[in-house]
Every structure is written in C-alpha cells, then in structure tokens.
Amino acid sequence: MREDLRPFWVKQLYVSFRAAWIHWFIRPRCVHLGVHAAIMSPWYVDISGPNISIGHSFTAINTVSQRVHIGVWGRGVGEGRIMLGNACLMSPGSRISASDEIVLGDGCMLANGAYITDSDWHGLYNRIDRDDASTPVRLGDNVWVGDHATVLKGVTIGDNSVVAARSVVTKNVPANVVVAGNPA
C-alpha cells in the first residue's frame, strides 16, 4: 500500500471538507443517514428521490468514472423506498434503483458495478409507458453481491449468502449459500 506523504494538516483539512460535504449535501437527501458515514469523494455520490434511509457506519467508495448511485423513482409522489442497514459497503459503480422497496440488512457489501433493482422500468414493446409491475427486493444480513452481479425484482437473499461475480439473480436465495451463473 502506498504511504500517505501529505502533511497532517492537509489530510485533516481534506477530512474536514469531506465531512462538511456529507453534512450539507448528502444528509439532506436522506430521510436518515446514520453516524460515522465514510464516503470517499462524496461529491461523486448520486442520491436521488425520496425515502432513502442509510444506517450507521455506511461506507461508499467512488471515483470520477464510477459513481455510486442510490435512487428512488416511485410510481407516485412519495412512493418507493430504499433502506440500507448498518455497516453497509458500496464499491465504485454500484447502483441501487427502487420503484417499490429495496431493503439491505446489516453488513451487506456491494462489489464494483453491482446492480440491485426492483422493477423492469418499462415494457418490452411499449418503452414510453412505465411498467408498474415491481416487487420488493430484500437482502439479509452479511450478504455479499459480487463484481458486476445483478439482483432483479422480487428476490430475497438470505443471511450470510454470496452472489458470485457477473451473476444474475432471478429467484430467491436461501441463507448461507453461494450462488453463481446466469440465472443464478
């Protein structure tokens, strides 16, 4: 690992600026943002929509080209909800998009490019009108969603389960298992 050669006061200034950015720009976008949120480069986080609740000790890692996206686009005003438990981690490029409800338990990890959605967003032939068929997604405690894996609508993943890289989860996953493939 590379040694940090910045003077201490520069590092403290950066940490203070990052904390202020979280306080003034990230926290107002959430219904609840727990304490000890560690958001690396918080100016690259996209949080949009109502009813987003993030637990304590949330960590998000962002880059210029791979932003973290958390978004609610409910069918009506004030509809849709995302709830992240305590100690959740979102890696660069990970996305959570809710139309109805997405709930992540405590200690969940989303690897680089992971995608969780609870809706198809539009029909196959009629792409103008929105598809209203959305069903909630629930991830239990300590679930790890691998690199570029996708979790689709209506899926429940049990505690301590792992979704392998590039997998597409279309059905429920029991607790304490590893799933892989397309579909997983």
PLM regions and their residue ranges:
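Glycine-rich hexapeptide-repeat left-handed beta-helix
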Residues: 13, 104-106, 110-184
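Domain-scale signature associated with acetyltransferase and cell-envelope carbohydrate enzymes
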Residues: 1-117, 140-141, 159, 175, ...
